[in-house]
């Protein structure tokens, strides 16, 4: 049985709405069957300027709440992903897998569990006790380090996960993250007691993703059309 081949594209620091547009192009490509000979999906890696996002249960966040959060200096976006409110900002690795679940031989539930497992692998490789809890995401010592919220239509996924590397956690203090009362948030930097950047984490994250989903990740093959930073060969050193 062949191993799924997925592209990796690094978008860098990009606005949330712009990243949604990029996801949409990859989703449309998969729905159309893709170009002849092209890999069947992609992982889009990025970080965002400060933005609060809410999922499909957006009724809990009226215009007054949106105005309050915008007043802090952040953007505010309403989306079609699962889950409630969360924060994205610099120092947070965001991964948007645009994949066909059939190619991965996974149900939606198994896919979400796989995202959790990949991040848990990463955390444990760093010596951190990453774990699941009844609420979706990855937790370290009772605090959420990675939020997960996905959308799936016609077996094609979008949205994904956000892993706190050296994020300013103060932004989370203005909301109830993911609607979970009484739970805190944390970051790799806070847990390890040293600065951990996105560039430090991308390579081990991609390795953990490959191991969990039994796939092959390759750099985007058209950098002139998609001017982003792609993943180097593993022997080339850290990103």
UniProtKB/Swiss-Prot annotation:
<dbReference type="Pfam" id="PF21948">
    <property type="entry name" value="LplA-B_cat"/>
</dbReference>
<keyword id="KW-0496">Mitochondrion</keyword>
<feature type="binding site">
    <location>
        <begin position="160"/>
        <end position="162"/>
    </location>
    <ligand>
        <name>substrate</name>
    </ligand>
</feature>
<keyword id="KW-0436">Ligase</keyword>
<dbReference type="InterPro" id="IPR020605">
    <property type="entry name" value="Octanoyltransferase_CS"/>
</dbReference>
<comment type="function">
    <text>Catalyzes the transfer of endogenously produced octanoic acid from octanoyl-acyl-carrier-protein (octanoyl-ACP) onto the lipoyl domains of lipoate-dependent enzymes such as the protein H of the glycine cleavage system (GCSH). Lipoyl-ACP can also act as a substrate although octanoyl-ACP is likely to be the physiological substrate.</text>
</comment>
<feature type="binding site">
    <location>
        <begin position="147"/>
        <end position="149"/>
    </location>
    <ligand>
        <name>substrate</name>
    </ligand>
</feature>
<dbReference type="GO" id="GO:2000376">
    <property type="term" value="P:positive regulation of oxygen metabolic process"/>
</dbReference>
<dbReference type="GO" id="GO:0009249">
    <property type="term" value="P:protein lipoylation"/>
</dbReference>
<feature type="domain" description="BPL/LPL catalytic">
    <location>
        <begin position="37"/>
        <end position="217"/>
    </location>
</feature>
<comment type="similarity">
    <text>Belongs to the LipB family.</text>
</comment>
<dbReference type="GO" id="GO:0005739">
    <property type="term" value="C:mitochondrion"/>
</dbReference>
<feature type="active site" description="Acyl-thioester intermediate">
    <location>
        <position position="178"/>
    </location>
</feature>
<feature type="region of interest" description="Disordered">
    <location>
        <begin position="220"/>
        <end position="239"/>
    </location>
</feature>
<feature type="transit peptide" description="Mitochondrion">
    <location>
        <begin position="1"/>
        <end position="18"/>
    </location>
</feature>
<protein>
    <recommendedName>
        <fullName>Octanoyl-[acyl-carrier-protein]:protein N-octanoyltransferase LIPT2, mitochondrial</fullName>
        <ecNumber>2.3.1.181</ecNumber>
    </recommendedName>
</protein>
<feature type="site" description="Lowers pKa of active site Cys">
    <location>
        <position position="144"/>
    </location>
</feature>
<keyword id="KW-0808">Transferase</keyword>
<dbReference type="InterPro" id="IPR045864">
    <property type="entry name" value="aa-tRNA-synth_II/BPL/LPL"/>
</dbReference>
<keyword id="KW-0809">Transit peptide</keyword>
<keyword id="KW-0012">Acyltransferase</keyword>
<dbReference type="InterPro" id="IPR000544">
    <property type="entry name" value="Octanoyltransferase"/>
</dbReference>
<dbReference type="GO" id="GO:0016874">
    <property type="term" value="F:ligase activity"/>
</dbReference>
<dbReference type="InterPro" id="IPR004143">
    <property type="entry name" value="BPL_LPL_catalytic"/>
</dbReference>
<dbReference type="GO" id="GO:0033819">
    <property type="term" value="F:lipoyl(octanoyl) transferase activity"/>
</dbReference>
<feature type="binding site">
    <location>
        <begin position="81"/>
        <end position="88"/>
    </location>
    <ligand>
        <name>substrate</name>
    </ligand>
</feature>
<comment type="pathway">
    <text>Protein modification; protein lipoylation via endogenous pathway; protein N(6)-(lipoyl)lysine from octanoyl-[acyl-carrier-protein]: step 1/2.</text>
</comment>
